Structures are given as structure tokens and as C-alpha cells.
Amino acid sequence: MKRLIVILLGCLHLAAVHAQEFGGQLISEWQWDMNQHTNWLNQVRLDLNLPLWHGRGAIEAATLHLANIRHEALIDDWQGFSNIEAGNMLAAIAVLGYSHHWASARVFVGVRNVNEDFFTSPVTALFANSSCGIVPTIAASYPIANYPFSGLTFYFDVTRGRFTFRNSLCNGVG
């Protein structure tokens, strides 16, 4: 038993040596429809960044874990009123791919959610009335990788002074 524990800890140590950044975020909300129904929603996001090539490149990974106590939504509306309500889901891939950085540009190739770069801020999940996570006409009219789904993506951005130009080529919902 000791040998097994030592081997497992050694493997974890080797994996942790290369992990430059590992983080998590928990967002929880309680819903009430002002009648008899309530719901408790939780979203856990785990992020991992493994630097390569002396910090110029990186393997990026992020997963979303969603849980709520009700199987159906509180209101009969396809948009809902929560930025994190998406049904129960274990380990949905939000980001998985390779990014490379230059002085003023960045390229990413892999699986990515469109909300990662364009339609959200670090505090978006804390507000109600999500409009499906992004601009509602985009979410309703085009098959894009909207929250909580991701799709194959080629993304790049270029920064000049105060301006940043961003562009993505996505294959739709993954």
C-alpha cells in the first residue's frame, strides 16, 4: 500500500512540476419564481495553463462543471434568466488547445467557446437575464459554440496601443 501511495504521489509531483497555472472558480445562485418553486445552480470552472517554448506557447485547458437541484427550468422560456443555467453537466470542455504569443499578437488552435473572447467579461455570470450568454440574435440565428458548448476554433488577436483586433474561425457547435 505504501508503495502504491509513493508511486501515485510521484506521478502527481511530475505532473505538477510542469503546471504553471491551475485555478478554479465557483459561481452559485439561488432562484425563486415568487411562487413555490426554487432552484440552486452551481458552476465550477477549472483552468490549466502549461507553458511551452520559454513562455511563448502554452497548452490551455478549461472545463465547466454544472449542477442544479431541479431537472427543469423554473420559467417556461428558452432564454431563462440565469447566465449559468444549462442543465447538469460534468466536465464540459470550454477550452482545449495550443496558443502561441508574440510581442503584440496571439494565436490559438483547438476547442474553444466563443464567449471566451468576445461576448463576456470576468463578471458576466454574476448577472441575470443572460440572453443565451451572448447577443440573442446571434445565439438564435447561427449554429455557434455558445455557452456551455465549444467548437473547433482558430482564434487570433493583434494589439496595437489601446486597440485590439480579434478574429475567430469556428466550425459551429461542437
Question: Would you name each region that the model predicts?
Answer:
Residues 31-35, 80-84, 139-142:
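Extracellular loop and loop/strand-boundary signature of outer-membrane beta-barrel proteins
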Residues 18-33, 57-61, 130:
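Transmembrane beta-strand segments of Gram-negative outer membrane beta-barrel proteins
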Residues 4-13:
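Sec-dependent N-terminal signal peptides
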Residues 50-137, 147-172:
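Outer membrane beta-barrel
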Residues 38-52:
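Short catalytic helix/loop segments, enriched in acidic residues and glycine
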